[in-house]
Amino acid sequence: VTNSLPIALDLSSAGAGDVQLLGGSVRAITQAVVGGTALRTLALMRADVAFIGTNALTIDHGLSTADAQEAAVKSAMVTNAHTMVVLCDSTKIGNDYLVSFAPLDAIDVVITDEGAPETFVEELRRNDIKVVLARI
């Protein structure tokens, strides 16, 4: 299940099986599906794992983004998943955006790059968050 048009197309082109794309309005800038239809659909679903992208990640405010509609969809995904994996490159660490959509204690795993500040990585681990450092 995804709200991202590019990800849905990539997965289906790669033969990933049955890809569910949420319905709703499409934001031109991100090509993400948002709105009431997407939220109602997500309310009916449960996922073992949610992979969530973010615009910003801080210890105090968790995950945030600039758009309230995208934040609502991401928040619903977080709520309805057993495990939450955050995809966040190091340039987004320590930044805050307008709308917070998940607190730090909702995160199970953060996948970031080796540019992440070591003190930040240590703080995530102190909060029982697994950190995966990817080479780029």
Task: For each feature predicted by the language model, list its residue ranges.
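Conserved phosphate- and dinucleotide-binding cores of soluble alpha/beta proteins
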Residues: P6-I136
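Catalytic beta/alpha-barrel core
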Residues: V1-T2
